[in-house]
């Protein structure tokens, strides 16, 4: 991928896998999903607050983000599902804060993919294709 190439969407299979992961958690832990949805929405609301920085990472310097991180890696399938909506690209920071398995992280040394959040967003969905949660 070159610098000005369009950012490709995740494959249909990866998108379907993200939906399946969300649905599995919704069936097995509906209260977790409810709590996650409430916390994620509260965090989304903070994204529109004025900040003193143009850096997207500043959206993580809020209590709402910390509450999501405290929920632990059990919410990873829910985060991947949220990344299907490109408006939720800030969720990349939440995913990276929760994921501990390097096989499912976008390589930070791959600067083009790591620094472009939308690209990282789509790669996260893709690398989780078929993952057993």
Language-model segments: residues:
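Extended repeat-based scaffolds of very large eukaryotic assembly and lipid-transport proteins
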Residues: 1-133
